[in-house]
Amino acid sequence: MQSNNPFLKNKSFEKPQVIQVDEEGNRSVIIDYNETMTISGTINKSLIMLLILVVTATLTWTMTATGYNPMPFLIGGGLIGFVLVLIASFKPHLSTYLAPGYALFEGLFIGALSAIFEAMYPGIVIQAVGATFTTFLVCFMLYKYKVVTVTEKFKSVVIGATITIAIYYLITWLLSMFTSFQPVHYGNSLMSIGISVLVIVVAALNLFLDFDQIEKGAQKQLPKYMEWFGAMGLMITLVWLYVEFLRLLSKISSRD
């Protein structure tokens, strides 16, 4: 099984085949090494996306603090970001344009969401940011020094857990929308906190899949636009992780 992340699918990360046939009918693979995916290039794209996200999130936060309604940013940014994700998952060659756009609109979403949580629990945003990047660095070091190796079994377990979480969230959201059902992960009970911790663990494990696919994409010398594609997939995981940390910290804070 491959990563459930729409930006880390099998077909997108297959090695490109550029075939040249000479006059005698001999076939050879031609690759332009100046136009292929690299790890350093993906890192640079990830940093550019992070900068865009931080700038737009900061602007949204500032506007919300001065009296603007955060809901248009929250809903609009989230929906448009989701649409860009869907388009890029089917048209990865457009990632050069879609990835920066995703970072921009996701910044609107993150800025509005952060402002809402910060208003309720002062100091929670810096804690969530710190927890997110600490988790990222720990996972990166564990992957870099081969403490954690991404095997097929590892992928299967992580993907299965992630799909289960997605289905659970979708079903409970629909039930809560149209019935009086109260999902167990709502509120600040110990069980709810435990579920949040479990989801954070699964989100963190997805980082290993992201690292593995980016590394293999570079090894396979994929097209240059796959740097944006890989960076976009990594950004999705980081945003998910940050949102889950916000939720966990808010549950803990509300118990005080």
Positions of PLM-derived features:
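A hydrophobic alpha-helical transmembrane-helix feature that marks the membrane cores
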Residues: 1-256
